[in-house]
């Protein structure tokens, strides 16, 4: 019997699972027919229901928008991995790691502590921080106790900005007052700063970690943005710095996915005159190992996805996005050794996306209610036997997937995490049916009414539950209780997710007659144009980002890794929605990002 290799949390360890039982294993397999993107534009198709129904609309014609299948799914089947290359990379990494660790921890004294923090910034930017978590924690804890002494007399814009960025990035509430020294007598930032391109860029990056109370950082963001655009366009900066400035203006490092940063930063660092050759090599080795690990997982996942047989069992209303799921999950589970967490989360996201598409894109209200009722009971309701085959398939897939989670986590005494996640999944289903009732009636509620339901339907709560479940023993019962309490951090993440989804998905919604969204609700309630609604909703997203930063810094009594996972989910959203609705339409920047991770392997 063929064996499938899956890597688990300890770097280099493996477990072999038989193909008949699949990933965890899965008790039932369904398959998928792979096709490429069509050359013609999207079109509406009309599909006649063929299953026996008891409703009056038995012979009704459904109208829905067929989405193109993903070109990436086919790519996953063609992947070839050289395991010996991965082993060789691990050996080189293991040899270099203690040398770099010694370098990081060898700095002593106040000035040397600054150098250590600047090196931490390099480690984060080069994608290496996960190798040195204990050393970074020890350094920042010790340094923050002497922060005033360390910052006293420091007048280099780059140094101050990077130190500020590193501390806030790791949850230390360093005061924005450190930037007061760069203001002139008129209360504005000194114009002389504009001659320091790297300093201006670092100040811009630091300003993106501002809270609702950091007014000086809002000024810094405005000041740096306009001048950096001019610097990048003027040709006075080195070309590699101009590229980095333009990338940062498009998406700041703070809101970028951690594993995407080194895609741009490694080439930048290599062109820096004073780069460290050993650190650069270590970054390339580590990134290459991550790429190969991801590809190995994709080969397994695309095989599993093909065997799910969605195309045979479902009308073509669902988003075929298994590889896109893997890419986005990397936002939370980045390091190569977290293979188990990624795979479990991808299975979970597949169920969430199928649920959303079924409610949002295809099911009649009768069918949607039956599915929601069955999920609430966590078993088929009486009406389910009379529902179309496709709907029973959706329900069975969801129930079977969670049963496999229980089988996987039960021996670890973590069934509570599956049960808690099920409850969040049910809440998402209920919110879906509430929105569906409005949508099918073409009802546009008040903005407040819509957001109350929409913040749950956008599945932030359900996604975080799945993330916590996938973490294994790290996420205790208290983690799920914290999520259940709906803390402010998570509430504002839901606001951000709901609005970004509706802003970027607005044209898609309207093209299929789906009028119940935040834009239309805001337009109706406040009597404004679409353009005005977009502008005001974007302001709410910006304000939500500041609150996220604030809550990340001020929340106490919650493990740091849970707070980081929440912010990482925010980063996933930012990348997915930065230019368009990147999950539904994975073109443009999303395609560039995925190509850099899965196709263009780094040269060492």
Swiss-Prot record:
It comes from the Eukaryota. A motif (DDXXD motif) lies at residues 356-360. It is found in: Cytoplasm. GO terms for biological process: diterpenoid biosynthetic process. Its EC number is 4.2.3.-. Pfam families: Terpene_synth, Terpene_synth_C. Binds 3 Mg(2+) or Mn(2+) ions per subunit. PANTHER family: OS04G0344100 PROTEIN-RELATED, TERPENOID SYNTHASE 9. The Asp-Asp-Xaa-Xaa-Asp/Glu (DDXXD/E) motif is important for the catalytic activity, presumably through binding to Mg(2+). Belongs to the terpene synthase family. Tpsa subfamily. This is Putative terpenoid synthase 7. It comes from Arabidopsis thaliana. The lineage of its organism: Eukaryota, Viridiplantae, Streptophyta, Embryophyta, Tracheophyta.
């Amino acid at each position: 019997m063929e064996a499938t290799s899956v890597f688990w949390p300890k770097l280099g360890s493996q477990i072999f699972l038989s193909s008949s039982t699949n990933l965890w294993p899965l008790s039932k397999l369904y398959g998928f027919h792979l096709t490429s993107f069509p050359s013609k534009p999207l079109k509406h198709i009309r599909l006649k229901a063929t299953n026996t129904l008891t409703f009056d609309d038995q012979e009704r014609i459904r109208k829905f928008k067929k989405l193109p299948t993903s070109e990436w799914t086919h790519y996953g089947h063609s992947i070839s991995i050289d395991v010996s290359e991965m082993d060789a990379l691990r050996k080189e990494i293991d040899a270099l790691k203690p040398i770099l660790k010694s370098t990081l921890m060898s700095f002593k004294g106040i000035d040397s502590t600054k150098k250590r923090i600047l090196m931490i910034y390099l480690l984060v930017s080069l994608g290496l921080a996960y190798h040195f978590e204990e050393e970074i924690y020890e350094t920042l804890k010790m340094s923050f106790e002497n922060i005033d002494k360390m910052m006293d007399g420091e007048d280099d814009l780059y140094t101050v900005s990077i130190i500020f960025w590193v501390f806030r990035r790791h949850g230390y509430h360093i005061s924005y007052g450190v930037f007061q020294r760069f203001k002139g007598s008129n209360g504005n930032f000194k114009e002389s700063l504009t001659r320091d391109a790297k300093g201006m860029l670092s100040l811009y990056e630091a300003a993106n970690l501002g809270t609702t109370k950091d007014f000086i950082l809002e000024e810094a963001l405005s000041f740096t943005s306009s001048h950096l655009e001019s610097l990048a366009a003027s040709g006075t900066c080195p070309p590699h710095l101009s590229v980095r400035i333009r990338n940062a203006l498009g998406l700041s490092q703070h809101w970028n996915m951690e594993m995407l940063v080194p895609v741009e930063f490694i080439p930048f660092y290599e062109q820096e005159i004073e780069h460290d050759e050993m650190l650069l090599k270590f970054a390339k080795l580590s990134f290459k190992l991550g790429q190969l690990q991801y590809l190995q997982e994709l080969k397994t996942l695309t095989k599993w996805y093909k065997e799910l047989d969605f195309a045979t069992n479902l009308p073509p209303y669902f988003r075929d996005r298994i590889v896109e799921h893997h890419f986005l999950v990397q936002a939370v589970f980045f390091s190569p050794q977290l293979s188990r967490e990624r795979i479990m989360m991808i299975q979970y996201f597949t169920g969430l996306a199928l649920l959303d598409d079924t409610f949002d894109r295809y099911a009649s209200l009768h069918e949607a209610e039956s599915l929601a009722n069955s999920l609430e009971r966590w078993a088929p309701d009486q009406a389910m036997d009379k529902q179309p085959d496709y709907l029973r398939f959706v329900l069975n897939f969801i129930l079977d997937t969670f049963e496999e989670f229980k089988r996987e986590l039960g021996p670890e005494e973590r069934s509570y995490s599956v049960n808690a996640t099920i409850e969040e999944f049910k809440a998402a289903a209920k919110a879906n049916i509430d929105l569906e009732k409005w949508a099918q009636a073409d009802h546009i509620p008040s903005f407040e009414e819509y957001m109350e339901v929409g913040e749950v339907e956008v599945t932030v709560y359900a996604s975080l539950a799945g993330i916590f479940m996938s973490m294994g023993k790290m996420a205790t019962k208290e983690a799920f209780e914290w999520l259940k309490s709906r803390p402010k951090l998570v509430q504002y993440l839901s606001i951000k997710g709901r609005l970004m989804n509706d802003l970027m998905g607005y044209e898609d919604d309207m093209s299929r007659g789906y009028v119940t969204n935040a834009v239309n609700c805001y337009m109706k309630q406040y009597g404004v144009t679409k353009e005005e609604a977009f502008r005001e909703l974007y302001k709410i997203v910006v304000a939500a980002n500041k609150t996220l930063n604030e809550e990340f810094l001020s929340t106490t009594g919650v493990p740091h890794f849970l707070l980081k996972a929440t912010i990482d989910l925010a980063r996933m959203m930012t990348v997915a929605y930065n230019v368009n609705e990147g999950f539904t339409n994975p073109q443009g920047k999303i395609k560039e990002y995925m190509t850099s991770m899965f196709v263009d392997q780094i040269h060492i």
